[in-house]
A protein has these predicted regions:
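Histidine/acidic residue-rich metal-binding segments in metalloenzymes
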Residues: 135-303
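C-terminal cap of metal-dependent C-N hydrolases
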Residues: 318-321, 375-427
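N-terminal metal-binding scaffold of metallo-dependent hydrolase/deaminase domains
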Residues: 1-39
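Metal-associated gating/positioning segment near the N- to mid-region
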Residues: 48-112
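Divalent metal-coordination and catalytic microenvironments
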Residues: 8, 23, 28, 49, ...
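His/Asp/Glu-enriched, well-ordered alpha-helical/loop segment
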Residues: 199-227, 294-297, 301-303, 308-381
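Alpha-helix-loop-beta-strand connector modules within alpha/beta enzyme cores
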Residues: 102-119, 167-178, 335
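Active-site metal-binding motif and surrounding structural segment of the metallo-beta-lactamase
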Residues: 36-53
Length: 429
């Protein structure tokens, strides 16, 4: 049966649409978009007061399967994604076994098709076992559906190895996503190096440990002609390096997380909240402001979560022993609405670019547009809905949110993936 979505405020800058119209879904496609549509026999849903946009895509997510299902699995991770308004996620390869060959890529895809609540686009490791010693089977992974290459978690430490990966792998047309972390400089760093790390007696993580590799990777991308994407950028100077690389004509893009925009090192205190232990670490107020401005002015290309679930017992350990990472799929859209859109600092149109259009473009995915003939991957949200993070639990298996207890305004209400509803009135279908 066809589904007619009435009176939604549709925003899609790719087709210059920003206004109240009706959208007709028939099967897995959008059949018609227009005013005052009336279709005999169609189910009708009134979306008055809500926004409808192309389906959101998070291009940096840890689903943990295979190997770490105690933290998260594809079913629970994609359920959290649907709750947060996402129609697709790009999964990171630091699984067990590592996603460094076509067999594991095929497993992730087949598992997602079986139990997933959204689309899953697997990324593959640049190097075998994420060890930085030998190139992975890039061609095999692409043949099975890998959309990008990354050694996310520690990055490729050797410049020569990164060059070889880019020189060889660029023939497949995929983007290389760099986790920029110079392990010699970072050492056993726990939080940003500065006054807070000194006060809390925690080993510092210098900003230069990220910035040096951003500069290095941009130079290698320039040398090889490969497409480069800088992951979870967290410093003002790192953003300036990316800005300069773009101006020089290098094929470089970058992403930012809500926690690097809306949390800082000053949120850490003597409670040693391990949910605030992330990689890269929360930086200074000035860094967070620079990242927010980069998101608004176009330097930052995509907003991602770096959703990193861990078990409660892992995060309950001493700060130095607890793993890095926080969950974010269920809060990302709401945080952006609360902090940027509802405050008038950023338009809904710009948000759609950051969370739907550019992620698909960077990953080489087919674009979703709110027009007849396009795949019906759609996100509906209520920009005025108020809720408290964690008050009703999480869809994710994990609870390590750095925003727990915060009241937010704006939340996804409905999600459609290929015309199939995965979230209805805020509930997983």
């Amino acid at each position: 049966m066809a589904l007619l979505l009435k009176n939604a405020h549709v925003v899609d800058p790719s087709v210059e649409l920003d206004g109240v119209v009706d959208v007709l879904i028939d099967g897995d496609k959008i059949a018609e978009v227009g005013e005052n549509l009336a279709v005999e026999g169609a189910e009708v849903r009134d979306l008055s007061g809500k926004y409808l946009v192309p389906g959101l895509v998070d291009m940096h997510v840890h689903l943990r399967e295979p190997g770490y299902e105690v933290k998260e699995d594809i079913e629970s991770g994609t359920r959290a994604a649907a709750k947060g308004g996402f129609t697709g996620v790009c999964s990171m390869p630091n699984t067990d076994p590592v996603t460094d060959n076509g067999t594991v890529v095929e497993f992730v895809k087949s598992r997602a098709a079986e139990v997933g609540h959204c689309r899953v686009y697997p990324s593959g490791a640049m190097t075998r076992g994420l060890k930085g010693e030998a190139m992975s089977e890039m061609g095999d992974m692409v043949a099975h559906g890998a959309v990008a290459f990354t050694d996310d978690g520690r990055g490729v430490q050797g410049a020569g190895m990164l060059r070889r990966c880019m020189d060889y792998g660029k023939m497949f047309g995929k983007v290389f996503m760099s986790h920029c972390q110079d392990e010699d400089l970072v050492g056993h760093g726990q939080i940003n190096e500065g006054k807070v790390s000194t006060r809390l007696a925690l080993e510092g993580w210098p900003a230069a440990g990220e910035e040096l590799q951003i500069a290095r990777d941009i130079e290698i991308a320039k040398l090889t002609g490969a497409k480069l994407h800088i992951q979870h950028i967290s410093t003002a100077h790192g953003l300036e390096i990316v800005r300069a690389g773009k101006a020089a004509g290098v094929q470089v893009t970058c992403e930012a997380t809500p926690h690097h925009m809306f949390l800082t090192e000053n949120d850490l205190d003597e409670t040693y909240n391990t949910s605030l232990k992330v990689n890269p670490p929360l930086r200074t107020d000035e860094d967070a402001e620079a990242i927010r401005q980069g998101v608004i002015d176009g330097t930052v290309d995509a907003i991602v979560t770096d959703h990193a679930p861990h078990t409660p017992w892992e995060k309950a350990r001493e700060f130095e022993l607890a793993p890095f990472g926080m969950i974010g799929l269920e809060t990302s859209l709401s945080l952006v609405l609360t902090e940027l859109v509802n405050t008038g600092k950023m338009s809904v149109s710009r948000m759609v670019e950051l969370m739907a259009i550019k992620p698909r473009e960077i990953l080489g995915l087919d674009q979703v547009q709110v027009k007849a003939g396009s795949v019906a991957d759609l996100t509906v949200f209520d920009a005025s809905a108020t809720w408290t993070v964690g008050e009703d639990g999480y869809e994710s298996r994990a609870e390590n949110s750095g925003f727990a207890g915060r009241t937010l305004t704006g939340r996804a209400t409905d999600v459609f993936v290929g015309g199939k509803q995965t979230l209805a009135d805020g509930c997983i279908c």
